[in-house]
Amino acid sequence: IQLKKTDAVEDAIIVGDPARVDQVAKFLTEFRELKYNREFRSLRGTYKNKEVLVLSTGVGAPSAAIAIEELHNIGVKRIIRVGSAGALQLGIGLGNPIIGEGAVRDDGLTKMYVPEQYPAVPSSTLLAKAKEIAPEAIYGIIRSHDGFYMDNNEQTQEYWSNFGLIGEDMESGALFTVGRLRGIETLSILNNVVAYKEDLQAGVNDLVSGDDKVIEGEKRTIEIALEVLNK
């Protein structure tokens, strides 16, 4: 990420897409760009007198883990992911915030850190704050995985849906696991961009084309994250 300790503050928001850094910046004052190297774009700004670092991590657990490790190295204490998810239950609409109370580690990266039995859970403190700030969000267990376009996506999603999981992404499991190992408080706040049983490509198209519900959901997830860090 090419940041120095002098660039850091204790609170950070990570996003996948470098373009989403601009969306977070709309909520900040006195922000300034820091670095842009590979998928890692960063800026620092102020939200209600609280300084926040914003960093993009690209797609997937490996690059997210690099970002988390390097944020830890420069002194960051709290990291909230603001990202996208696909729902795993009917009735979760586009733009609904999904907040993970834990994650199934269905990725390869975290298995390099800890045994499969090791749980991936967020900070109970940050989670409790989120429940106060956003009681309307959908809370539950999510799944973090490594691939979008698997031949057995439908069967895999149905399998995990039957266990009550609410959504899936690619980075939250890594955030919870690496964050826990490094003593960082973490939380993942996700904007639902694919309804359960909907075609993945249709959901991606909604995100890219700017579906109103998806846009409003993105704004709401950013707002929740900033309010949690400010509380």
Question: Can you describe what each PLM-predicted range is?
Answer:
Residues 88-90, 106-108, 148-153, 197-198:
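Short acidic/glycine-rich loop or secondary-structure boundary segments that cap or lie
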Residues 198-231:
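His/Asp/Glu-rich mid-to-C-terminal helical/loop segments that flank catalytic regions of hydrolases
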Residues 96-100, 186, 205-207:
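Short, hinge-like loop/turn segments at secondary-structure boundaries
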Residues 31-36, 136-141, 231:
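Flexible, glycine/charged-enriched surface loops at secondary-structure junctions
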